């Protein structure tokens, strides 16, 4: 048997209809503000409920639970938590530009702390909130039934100031959202007045009086083009940046102090984010982060390491954290019951139109009230003019109804007038009372004439709106908090914040790197101490020295065939006596990975050039410098190495240079690099020298005929030979003898080309470092034994050596382009 209470419906149709009904309910009745008063229904009901409850600024605070319960029971049946959260937000100085609720107790913080439970807090309306409800009892707005028909509530509040602009709005509806920023009260009122005075004004002209948002938390707005676009179209984006300053402590360290955060930014989350970035090494140079905020204001301190640049770190903080954010305008509001994206001008026009309606309705209400009172007074005056006759009619009437009828008939009075005469007390029959009534009647006639004039003249309505807003401005306006910066925010690179200056980069044999100002280096050079003033220990020495600029890019090639990049300014600056920073703190090197060569990749010097790679197994490769323009933070493969092979060094070449390669068994090969075509980064390369059994490459250099070839053997023998003794041949051969290897002098430790003025630093397998000038080493023929250049212990052997600058040389003599390779043999 079919149940007559069941109705068959199409599921698809029902879903569409029900969802549309739900969506429109959320859009119109919950999530979006009305363009007229700038309030969502929940905020409007809270303020109206508080007003009806008498929780006004001149009365004591009331428990929040009482307020939310009253609002929920009468007007907003959606749960007390949503009502309380909305009320809390209206009481937070960092959320509302002008708070509409005066909270007493814990109402949260801008650190994201929640408010105390509603049973613990108290609230009342703020003074400016009264301006939203002023004249609500004068028929200025329409009322509607509440959800169950037991109460009446306003459809919209009179809103005597442009609240939508002043406090903004945020909300997410179904398929749409609104995000309207707050503005300065005085500027918003001035903008409304400008439109009333100059209806044809443009958005740009409006921005002369309302230049941009004014957030309660202050901060900086970077640039104005985004503001103009948003005001013109209702949609746009601006960049908000924290207000910061860099302080210098008494110890000379720098610290970044944040005093204002962008609107809506959680200070605690920023703190956690910065700490996490520092721990993950994504942000170097920060030693501590403290929140020193108090009742006196926000103070967020970021301590900077002594050698780090606070300006660079601050720039990275803007890039990586919420110290700089984007605020996206989406000025969506309810206009005539329909959600619509509105421009600034449309918001103001709607507000002006609404205020005209409010003033007209209020004026009509006052006029009707005055006319009703004047009507009564007119009857009283008639009665007083015929007092004896009136008294006689009343005395001779059996009932008040008969008396009222007689009075109406005799003096042509209305029912209300006759009733007022009957209700009049005897004391009002005196002559003085008659004068008072006459005076009140005359005043009412003047008032009625004035109110009628207002209704007849639209310009007077405009004047009233302006005068009343000026009074609100005088009482509640305060200075702008958000500063508008001229010019757009640029995506600044760190080097934009670093002064370009000439510097020296040094890398020690043990991997300590630092940056020195060249001026300081020159000063200590004149003192005659040379590179000994570079702060290394007795068991360490400067192995790489590069003259560069703070804006230049340095490439670091490792024995694993990888390349890393650093800007010179990213290398910490130290004094000349300081040791420096372990390079593993700057580059993500793997275990056993060491820097073989540092090359300055300045575009002017590397344009059209190539990198020439040489490996321990005799493989060579030439790759254009342009292949290395984009190097990731964790490095890039520079060449593919075979198993067991290592990169010996990298040379910056012109494409037509001669190259000489030396091997451990004392052979060398010289060839022109043009015989090798340019290859990609992933290529392995070609054979540069054919190695004998158990042989390996120990050095490679660019070579010119006016240079000399310096070789040093494991047992402390060395010699210089003219480059002309090394003929240019094809690559890939076994090479010719460059030294006569015997048990006496030992295998070749390294080969390098020299000009004859350099010093060399030699290190043994015992860690002993010996320094001597190249000129002290004898010149001999190519296939000779060499001469003893240093005395070694019985079990000591030379494992590597490198060229360094002579102690008495000037800065101009430093070999900045690093033509010569560094002889290395660390794997033994």
Swiss-Prot record:
Q: Where in the cell is it found?
A: Cytoplasm
Keyword Nucleotide-binding tagged: yes
Protein's UniProt keywords contain Nucleotide-binding: yes
Which branch of life, at top level? Bacteria
Q: Which UniProt keywords apply?
A: ATP-binding, Cytoplasm, DNA-binding, Isomerase, Nucleotide-binding, Topoisomerase
- The short sequence motif called GyrA-box sits at 524-530
Q: What is its EC number?
A: 5.6.2.2
* GO cellular component labels: chromosome; cytoplasm; DNA topoisomerase type II (double strand cut, ATP-hydrolyzing) complex
Q: Where is the Topo IIA-type catalytic domain?
A: 32-497
Chemical reaction(s) catalysed: ATP-dependent breakage, passage and rejoining of double-stranded DNA
Catalytic positions are 120 (o-(5'-phospho-dna)-tyrosine intermediate)
For this protein, what is any one GO molecular function term? DNA binding
The record's section on Pfam families has: DNA_gyraseA_C, DNA_topoisoIV
Q: How does it assemble?
A: Heterotetramer, composed of two GyrA and two GyrB chains. In the heterotetramer, GyrA contains the active site tyrosine that forms a transient covalent intermediate with DNA, while GyrB binds cofactors and catalyzes ATP hydrolysis.
Q: Which family does it belong to?
A: Belongs to the type II topoisomerase GyrA/ParC subunit family.
Q: What is this protein called?
A: DNA gyrase subunit A
């Amino acid at each position: 048997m079919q149940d007559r209470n069941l109705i068959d419906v199409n599921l698809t149709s029902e879903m569409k209809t029900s969802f549309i009904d739900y969506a429109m309910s959320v859009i119109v009745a919950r999530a979006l503000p009305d363009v007229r008063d700038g309030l969502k229904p929940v905020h409007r009901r809270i303020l109206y409920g508080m007003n009806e409850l008498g929780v006004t600024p001149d009365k004591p605070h009331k428990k929040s639970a009482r307020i939310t319960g009253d609002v929920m029971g009468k007007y907003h049946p959606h749960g007390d938590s949503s009502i309380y959260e909305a009320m809390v937000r209206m009481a937070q100085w960092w959320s509302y530009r002008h708070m509409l609720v005066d909270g007493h107790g814990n109402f949260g913080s801008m650190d994201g702390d929640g408010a105390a439970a509603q049973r613990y807090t108290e609230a009342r309306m703020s003074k400016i909130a009264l301006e939203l409800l002023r004249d609500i009892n004068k028929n200025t707005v329409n009322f509607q039934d509440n959800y169950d028909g037991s109460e009446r509530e306003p459809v919209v509040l009179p809103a005597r100031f442009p609240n939508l602009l002043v406090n903004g709005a945020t909300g997410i509806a179904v398929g749409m959202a609104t995000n309207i920023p707050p503005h300065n009260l005085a500027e918003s009122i001035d903008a409304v007045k400008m439109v009333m005075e100059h209806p044809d004004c443009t958005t740009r002209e409006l921005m002369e009086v309302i230049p941009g948002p004014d957030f309660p938390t202050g901060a900086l707005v970077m640039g104005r083009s985004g503001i103009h676009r948003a005001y013109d179209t209702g949609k746009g984006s601006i960049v908000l940046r924290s207000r910061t300053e860099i302080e210098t402590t008494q110890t000379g360290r720098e610290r970044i102090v944040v005093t204002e955060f962008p609107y809506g930014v959680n200070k605690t989350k920023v703190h956690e984010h910065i700490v996490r970035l520092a721990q993950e090494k994504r942000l170097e140079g920060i030693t501590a982060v403290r929140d020193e905020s108090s009742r006196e204001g926000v103070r967020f301190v970021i301590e900077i390491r002594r050698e780090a640049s606070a300006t660079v770190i601050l720039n990275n903080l803007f890039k990586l954290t919420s110290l700089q954010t984007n605020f996206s305008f989406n000025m969506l509001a309810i206009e005539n019951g329909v959600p619509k994206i509105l421009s600034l001008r449309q918001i103001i026009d709607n507000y002006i139109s609404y205020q005209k309606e409010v003033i007209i309705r209020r004026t009509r209400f006052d006029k009707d009230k005055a006319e009703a009172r004047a009507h009564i007074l007119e009857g009283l005056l008639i009665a007083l003019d015929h007092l004896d006759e009136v008294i006689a009619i009343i005395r001779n009437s059996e009932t008040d109804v008969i008396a009222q009828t007689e009075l109406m008939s005799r003096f042509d009075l209305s029912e209300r007038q006759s009733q007022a005469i009957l209700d009049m007390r005897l004391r009002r029959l005196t002559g003085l009372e008659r004068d008072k009534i006459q005076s009140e009647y005359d005043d009412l006639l003047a008032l009625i004439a004035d109110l009628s004039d207002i209704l007849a003249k639209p310009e007077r309505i405009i004047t009233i709106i302006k005068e009343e807003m000026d009074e609100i401005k005088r009482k509640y306006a305060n200075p702008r908090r958000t500063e508008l910066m001229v010019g757009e925010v640029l995506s600044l690179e760190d080097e934009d914040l670093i002064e370009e200056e000439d510097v020296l980069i040094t890398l020690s044999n043990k991997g300590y790197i630092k940056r020195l100002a060249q001026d300081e280096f020159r000063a200590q050079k004149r003192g005659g101490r040379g590179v000994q003033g570079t702060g290394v220990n007795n068991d360490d020495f400067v192995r790489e020295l590069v003259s560069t600029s703070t804006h230049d890019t340095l490439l670091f090639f490792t024995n694993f065939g990888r390349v890393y990049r650093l800007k010179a300014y990213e290398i910490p600056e130290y004094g000349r006596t300081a040791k420096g920073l372990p390079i593993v703190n700057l580059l993500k090197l793997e275990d056993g990975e060491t820097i073989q060569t540092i090359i300055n990749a300045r575009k002017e010097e590397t344009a059209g050039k190539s990198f020439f790679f040489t490996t321990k197994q005799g493989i060579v490769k030439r790759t254009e410098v342009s292949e290395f323009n984009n190097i990731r933070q964790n490095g890039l493969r520079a060449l593919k190495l075979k198993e067991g092979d290592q990169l010996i060094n990298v040379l910056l070449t012109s494409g037509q240079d001669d190259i000489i390669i030396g091997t451990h068994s004392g052979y060398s090969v010289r060839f022109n690099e043009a015989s090798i075509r340019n290859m990609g980064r992933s290529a392995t390369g070609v054979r540069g020298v054919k190695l004998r059994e158990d042989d390996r490459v120990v050095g490679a250099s660019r070579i010119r005929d006016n240079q000399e070839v310096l070789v040093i053997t494991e047992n402390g023998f060395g010699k210089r030979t003219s480059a002309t003794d090394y003929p240019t041949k094809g690559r890939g051969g076994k090479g010719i003898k460059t030294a006569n290897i015997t048990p006496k002098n030992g295998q070749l430790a390294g080969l390098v080309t020299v000009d004859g003025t350099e010093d060399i630093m030699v290190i043994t397998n015992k860690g002993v470092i010996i320094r001597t000038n190249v000129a002290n080493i004898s010149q001999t023929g190519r296939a000779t034994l060499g001469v003893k250049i240093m005395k070694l212990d019985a079990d000591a052997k030379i494992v590597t050596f490198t060229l360094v600058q002579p102690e008495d040389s000037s800065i101009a003599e430093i070999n900045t382009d690093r033509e010569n390779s560094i002889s290395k043999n660390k794997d033994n």
